[in-house]
Amino acid sequence: MKLKITLTKSLIACRFNQIKTAHCLGLKKINNQVIKDDTPAIHGMIKTISHLVVVEKVSYTKEQK
């Protein structure tokens, strides 16, 4: 299972660790989307910036690239 993570709010005025977490996930601008594996490490990152992102579960295959 994969997670589609969308940055919905700005990183301006966020704490430094929240900005770094968003960048590590690959989110730099509003409405950026990334697809990541559903792992405990990713869940921890999402928990850190949960007020800034929207998370959806997707079933992802190679044909959908």
UniProtKB/Swiss-Prot annotation:
GO terms for biological process: translation. It comes from the Bacteria. One of its GO terms (cellular component) is cytosolic large ribosomal subunit. Keywords: Ribonucleoprotein, Ribosomal protein. It holds the Pfam family Ribosomal_L30. The keyword Ribosomal protein applies. InterPro entries: Ribo_uL30_ferredoxin-like_sf (IPR036919), Ribosomal_uL30_bac-type (IPR005996), Ribosomal_uL30_ferredoxin-like (IPR016082). Belongs to the universal ribosomal protein uL30 family. Part of the 50S ribosomal subunit. NCBIfam families: rpmD_bact. This is Large ribosomal subunit protein uL30. The lineage of its organism: Bacteria, Bacillati, Mycoplasmatota, Mollicutes, Acholeplasmatales. The gene is rpmD.
